[in-house]
């Protein structure tokens, strides 16, 4: 998902995860009608969607493990053994299993984003929304995070990612949508003969 600053990329993402009301038109996501979405339904919507933010949104007063445990408890998990196993599984998947005891401020930006991606995977979401997931990262770390997201996508997960980084779009060729003038368009790659 591309577009200039202020084109509506983040607003679209926020609408998809229930943070903003759908203003006009129709829309549904993972079985929820965005026009009729009620406040009490939002937690259930978010259990089906993994969200990755540009600024990570990790709790600095908790370890990596406790950040993920917090999410599991908040989404209704009860069994401690299952929660521990799930946390280990997602941390292993993003290459952060050995850093479970660290606080977010002890991690690099790329490591924090890996933890944020692990958090998004906790409830086996149908869709992952990634809003500028490489926006605060250097080019090398951005490629590493994109490689990870690409690997997750290849495992069968759908990902909608907003970005300003056109180099990443060129390197990781996927369907591209553009926000412009309050509308959404599919960008069709042009081929030369």
Model regions and ranges:
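Short coil-to-helix segment of the ABC ATPase nucleotide-binding domain corresponding to the Q-loop/switch region
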Residues: 62-70
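Catalytic Walker B motif of ABC-type/P-loop ATPase nucleotide-binding domains
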Residues: 128-131
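ABC ATPase NBD coupling module
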Residues: 34-50, 152-154
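Helix-to-loop junction immediately C-terminal to a conserved catalytic motif
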Residues: 17
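Conserved ABC transporter NBD signature motif
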Residues: 25-33
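Conserved signature/switch motifs of ABC ATPase nucleotide-binding domains
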Residues: 102-105, 123, 155
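Conserved ABC ATPase signature
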Residues: 103-107, 111-113
């Amino acid at each position: 998902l591309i577009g200039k600053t202020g084109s509506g990329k983040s607003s679209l993402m926020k609408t998809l995860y229930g943070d903003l009301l759908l203003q006009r038109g129709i829309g549904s996501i993972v079985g929820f009608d965005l026009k009729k979405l009620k406040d009490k339904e939002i937690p259930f919507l978010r259990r089906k969607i993994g969200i990755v933010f540009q600024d990570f949104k990790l709790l600095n007063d908790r370890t990596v493990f406790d950040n993920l445990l917090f999410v599991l408890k908040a989404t209704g998990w009860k069994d401690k053994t299952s929660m521990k196993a799930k946390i280990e599984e997602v941390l292993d998947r993003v290459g952060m299993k050995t850093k479970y005891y660290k606080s977010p401020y002890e991690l690099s930006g790329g490591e924090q984003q890996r933890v944020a991606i692990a958090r998004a995977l906790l409830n086996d979401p149908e869709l992952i929304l990634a809003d500028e997931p490489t926006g605060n990262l250097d080019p090398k770390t951005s490629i590493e995070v994109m490689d990870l997201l690409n690997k997750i996508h290849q495992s069968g997960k759908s990902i909608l990612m907003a970005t300003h980084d056109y180099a990443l779009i060129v390197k990781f060729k996927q369907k591209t949508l553009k926000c412009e003038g309050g509308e959404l368009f599919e960008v069709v790659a042009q081929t030369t003969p």
